[in-house]
A protein has these predicted regions:
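N-terminal amphipathic/basic-hydrophobic helices that include classical n-h-c signal peptides
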Residues: 1-20
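C-terminal auxiliary extensions adjacent to catalytic cores
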Residues: 21-47, 51-58, 62-70, 179-507
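Glycine-rich, flexible loop motifs
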Residues: 22-37, 43-73, 100-158, 217, ...
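Polyanion/phosphate-binding surface patch
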Residues: 74, 89, 261
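FAD-binding core of FAD-dependent oxidoreductases
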Residues: 77-91, 95-99, 106-129, 159-181, ...
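Catalytic or ion-translocation cores adjacent to nucleophile or general acid/base/metal-coordination motifs
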Residues: 93-108, 365-377
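Alpha-helix capping at helix-to-loop junctions
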Residues: 128-132, 148-155, 164, 182, ...
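Short, surface-exposed recognition loops or helix-turn segments adjacent to catalytic cores
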Residues: 157-167, 245-247, 326
């Protein structure tokens, strides 16, 4: 499946469509080729999952290597030793199974509200895929059971808090493993008994934070595209100029995502009667930055999302447990450390906060009679008697403020744990929670902007906006009628927000 940041701007000259959806294909796990789009398909659309037969052979080979090392009497972390600060404690072979069982039971100590179902499904999928790399030393029955659970819709309750993301997401993955051994809150067809190394191989990894990151990156790209439609509609509503989106300007500063943003805006704003109505004799020389600099700002947002996508896409197929099996060797390392994903999530949070702030400023220009080039105050039919979008703009301002507070990076908030053995930790799950909250806020801000922009266009009739903007306006009107008198707007905002998440307005 195509990665999300690719092909954002149509390469053809056809019309932009809003809400086009493609049917996901079944996903086969081989530990090498899982994509973000695959994660979304399985996590949210219940696409079936299978295991690659050749990759299963590699899984079996790595298991034989672990068993051979045990027979040779080699000391292996987490196989015949304690964990973390207790790694110096040697564990007799006859207690190997109990060691793995104790690990799962003790580490299943997460707290807080449960993760949503799509996040749990993403985590399950990613954990199975990592095991399929053949470097974890587990039996094939582990990924096989995970896939059976996914395909049958068996999802354990996984608390959302309690992971610092250092030895991976120990608590969330332990709650998943608890179900697999028959001690969780969901019944599995055939609970397994964990053999040497298998408990550690299962819980040592970044799959909780990476699953959340994959879903967030997908949603962030959808919002990025939607924000361009909202920007185009706002520009039309206040009779702004598309001239600053001329390709020559952006080729002179060739940041790739700035160029793509400008190209998308040019396509959105082509053939506008509204533009032609004020092309000549307009006393305004230049629009405000929130209109004129949209490609520069959203282009930078796109660069941040592309960076995050690259890190997340790599992590989907990365071996993140410890120790790892390479041929006949079992090596200890630190691939479980979640810093790459925590950093990616912090970048997403900052990028989406920037997007949200820009959207709120455009919204202000549409509703403010001093800035809107002739639209009625707050888009009300009878300003004064009616308040129109006054409080909707205040709601957007409140959401922006919350985004800015939450944009403080989590990946620098290290708190040493486990007797100072884990002395540098990335806080990836905290970064994921913050980024998710910012995403939800930003979606609502763009929803309010879409509603206001659509209302603004009502006052410019019979002039017609650009064809793509007209289609977007019609799509918004399917969810929310024009404001003819004051009414509560909460339901309208939430409906449009839901459609944004579904990709209904993504150009």
């Amino acid at each position: 499946m195509q990665e999300l940041g690719a092909g954002v701007v149509n390469s053809h000259s056809g019309a932009l469509a809003f809400g086009a959806m493609t049917k996901p294909s079944p996903v086969t796990l081989d530990g090498q080729s899982l994509s973000i789009a695959d994660v979304v398909a399985v996590a949210r659309h219940n696409v079936s999952v299978a295991l690659d037969p050749q990759a299963l052979k590699a899984v079996q080979q790595s298991r034989r290597a672990v068993e051979a090392a045990i027979e040779r009497g080699e000391t292996m972390y987490g196989v015949n030793t304690g964990f973390g600060k207790l790694a110096h404690v040697r564990i007799p072979a006859e207690q190997g199974r109990q060691l793995q069982l104790n690990l799962i039971r003790s580490h299943a100590s997460g707290v807080g509200e449960p993760l949503p179902q799509d996040a749990v499904r993403a985590m399950m999928l990613l954990r199975a895929n990592v095991l399929m790399r053949g470097t974890s030393g587990v039996r094939p029955v582990l990924p096989e059971l995970l896939i059976e659970m996914l395909n049958r819709g068996l999802h354990p309750r996984v608390p959302s808090q309690g992971s610092v993301g250092a030895s991976g997401d120990l608590a969330p993955l332990s709650h998943l493993a608890l179900a697999m051994i028959g001690e969780g809150d969901v019944r599995v067809p055939k609970p397994i008994t964990l053999e040497a190394k298998e408990g550690l191989a299962f819980v040592n990894g970044t799959q909780a934070q990476t699953g959340l990151a994959a879903l967030l990156v997908s949603d962030a790209w959808t919002l990025w595209r939607t924000a361009h439609g909202a920007a185009a509609m706002s520009l039309e509503a206040v009779r702004g100029s598309p001239d600053p989106f001329d390709a020559r300007i952006h080729d002179a500063r060739p940041h790739p995502w700035q160029q793509r943003s400008a190209a998308l805006l040019r396509e959105l704003l082509a053939d506008s009667e509204i533009r032609e109505s004020h092309r000549d004799n307009d006393p305004r020389v230049q629009d405000a930055y929130s209109l004129r600099c949209t490609p520069q700002v959203l282009g930078a947002v796109g660069e941040g999302l592309a960076f995050a996508e690259r890190l997340v896409a790599t992590e989907l197929n990365a071996a993140t447990d410890n120790p790892l099996v390479f041929g006949d060797e079992v090596l200890s390392g630190g691939n479980f450390h979640g810093q790459p994903i925590a950093l990616a999530l912090d970048v997403v949070a900052i990028a989406l906060t920037t997007l949200a702030g820009l959207g709120e400023r455009r919204l202000e220009r549409v509703v403010n009679p001093d800035l809107s080039s002739g639209l009625p105050a707050f888009l009300a039919r009878e300003p004064g008697l009616e308040s129109g979008f006054m409080i909707a703009q205040i709601a957007a301002a409140a959401l922006v403020a919350e985004c800015r507070v939450l944009a403080t990076p989590a990946s620098v908030q290290s708190v040493p744990t486990e007797g100072n053995q884990e002395d540098v930790v990335p806080m990836g799950m905290t970064a994921a929670w913050k980024a998710g909250r910012i995403l939800a806020n930003a979606e609502r801000i763009i929803a309010i902007e879409l509603l206001a922009g659509a209302q603004g266009l009502e006052y410019l009739k019979p002039l017609r906006p650009a064809k793509a903007v007209a289609r977007l306006h019609a799509a918004v009107r399917q969810e929310s009628a024009a404001l003819t008198a004051d009414r509560p707007l909460t339901a309208d905002i939430e409906r449009v927000t839901l459609r944004i998440r579904e990709g209904r307005f993504a150009s």
